[in-house]
Amino acid sequence: FYDARGSALFEDITRLPEYYPTRTEQAIMAAHAPAMAQALGPGRTVIELGAGNCHKARALCTLIQARHYVAVDISEAFMQAAVAGMRQAFAHLPIDAVVADITGDWALPAQVPTARRLVFYPGSSIGNFDPPQAQALLARMRAVLGSDGALLVGVDLVKDAAVLNAAYDDAAGVTAAFNRNLLEHVNRLIGADFDPHQWHHRAFFNAAQSRIEMHLEAAQALEVCWRGGKRCFAQGERIHTENSYKYRVQDFV
């Protein structure tokens, strides 16, 4: 999903009226960030995973008087612009950028302090991993933190299915464009000839699995070719593109 256009489309999604996670998180942070900062203590190195536009870390870095800030994101072009803005806002704060898939092997620059690290993973992106994958990711975070580290992670909770479905299938079609953009990304990566206009966006809450599922559904019978291969899709056949798990507090803890 997260080429430069995918990242930009996701930023658009966060401003949609149907997409409750962003404004809910903003309200939580506005109400409770001072208490969080007091619990965390000053002088921490903030390591933000999936940093995006870096805006979420700004208030936190100010409140805890951050010693160092590291943005980690998979989209290099998008993140470099965001980090440039962060450096303007925090002229005296050491700032580093790491381009990485956080589910793979990645390392922090040598100059990043090892003591009093805070891994900051806001939003609800941990829900994009199935529970075993989420546990593995949390274990990676634990390894990054060290013995005196702390973790601040956002988790989306189970709620009414109508609210969930609307959040991932908005009336303006921005999430649909985000989903279809995956095909453009695949085209560039493997030389495929997916036509995004031949695919419908489908999103729904799977209550049995406690997750939103996003799919792309073939609008007609079609054939897709790529370097060294091809595949036929029947009308109505789906590609399962993303999950977003929703938790109950006791289940996540």
Regions found by a protein language model. Name each.
Residues Y2-G43:
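Class I SAM-dependent methyltransferase Rossmann-like catalytic core
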Residues G43-G52:
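Conserved class I S-adenosyl-L-methionine
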Residues N53-Q65:
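Conserved SAM-binding loop of SAM-dependent methyltransferases across substrates and taxa
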Residues S75-E76:
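Conserved SAM/SAH-binding beta-strand->alpha-helix loop
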Residues A115-Q135:
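A short SAM/SAH-binding and catalytic strip from SAM-dependent methyltransferases
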Residues Q135-S147:
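A short glycine-rich, Lys/Arg-flanked "PGG" loop and its adjoining helix->strand segment in the class I
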Residues V144-V158:
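Conserved beta-strand signature within the Rossmann-like core of class I S-adenosyl-L-methionine
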Residues L157, V163-V253:
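Substrate-binding/catalytic lobe of Class I Rossmann-like enzymes that use SAM or dcSAM, i.e.
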